[in-house]
Amino acid sequence: CLVHVLALGFEPAHRSLAIYNHGDAAVGEALRAESVCEAIHDAGGLAILAHPGRYRVGFADLIDAAAELGFDGGEAWYDYDMQTRWSWSPVVCEAIDRRLKNLGLLRTCGTDSHGLNLEGR
């Protein structure tokens, strides 16, 4: 399952991120979540699992796997209903928040930074 990973507080020019900064999508080993997480950590950042309720794999399994790989947190509060005006989705967000909290992971809110236009995100 391919997932989005949000990197926070990292050094953009760090050599461990070079493969991700050349404009093309990463392939092979560099595409693996474990490799992405390690590169972010090497660059001094935090690795966050973005919107764990949007994948074909259940969020509980994804969060558990991310924790095992060393992720620092997950995006708990997200607009899964993709409303015209951003609003979190109570039932799924509360369940994700509990799961992250029980694992001692950081919880984030909002968006995993897909560009400048956040309308509807």
Question: Residue ranges of each PLM-predicted region?
Answer:
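Short acidic/histidine-rich active-site segments
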Residues: 104-120
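His/Asp/Glu-enriched short active-site or ligand-binding loop at hydrolase and phosphoryl-transfer sites
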Residues: 71-85
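Alpha-helix termination/capping residues and helix-transition junctions
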Residues: 68-71, 102
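Alpha-helical scaffolding segments of alpha/beta enzyme cores, especially the outer helices
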Residues: 35-38, 61-64, 94-98, 102, ...
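Active-site beta-loop-alpha junctions enriched in small/polar residues
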Residues: 10, 52-53, 79-81, 112-116
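Extended substrate/RNA-proximal surfaces in nucleic-acid metabolism proteins
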Residues: 1-69
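Histidine/acidic-residue-rich catalytic or RNA/ligand-binding cores of hydrolases
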Residues: 1-4, 57-66, 83-95, 116-121
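Active-site neighborhood of phospho(di)ester-bond hydrolases with catalytic His/Asp-centered motifs
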Residues: 48-51, 74-77, 106-111
